[in-house]
Amino acid sequence: VIPERIADIVKGIARGCEKANTALIGGETAEHPGLLSEDEFDIAGAATGVVDADKQLGSHRVKAGDVIIAMPASGFHANGYSLVRHILATQKLDLHKQYEGFAKSLGEILLTPTEIYTLDCLALIKAQSENIKTFSHITGGGLADNTARVIPDGLIAKYDRTTWALPGEMKFMAEIAKVPQTDMERTWNCGIGMVAIVDPAIADLTIKSLAARGMKAWIAGSIHAQNGPGAAALEGNYLTR
């Protein structure tokens, strides 16, 4: 164990906890010689929250006509790195190189910290608890799979790709490795890290409230009636930069 490295790791975890207004109540450091090399480390963590049963958000609150408010991702976040590593290896990309169109090296881009949306979501709930239906954190599985988990039977969430542009780093990786769009959208967040499903009456207010907090959000779609289990789909073509 290198003390300075452990200190840097804990500082990073503490910064994340501060951004989520979460207490760091403990932890353990274990050495595994023979399993991890001196330059490797593995980190795991968990957070627990409490909510009154009658204040739970979820699919039971979602209705046809509700609006999908998207919050931008800061990058790949913590998902889809198996595909990223595959592309790095097969395309022989240089992590230290600053590729055309980017202000940082590829390695720096891939290490961009994951955006933490906790306080933004809590602020919306506090201000409009009756009209905030639910949230969906876009992690493994992409936009459609994650959103479908909070959509009840008989409804479908439809995203309009024309409302946002695919992040440059994802476009670059997909194009250079010829990744099909369907595979990309099942693996990466494609630029959206969190969505709030809200009553249409507060859609504009929600966007303004998030903007006041420094979060540039937008209307990315809406909820529609359909026959079948709850689902989500993406339509149209991404904006071009």
Cite the ranges covered by each PLM segment.
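Glycine-/charge-enriched secondary-structure boundary and capping motifs
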Residues: 5-20, 36-43, 100-111, 115-241
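Membrane-targeting and insertion segments and their boundary/processing signals
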Residues: 58, 91, 95, 143, ...
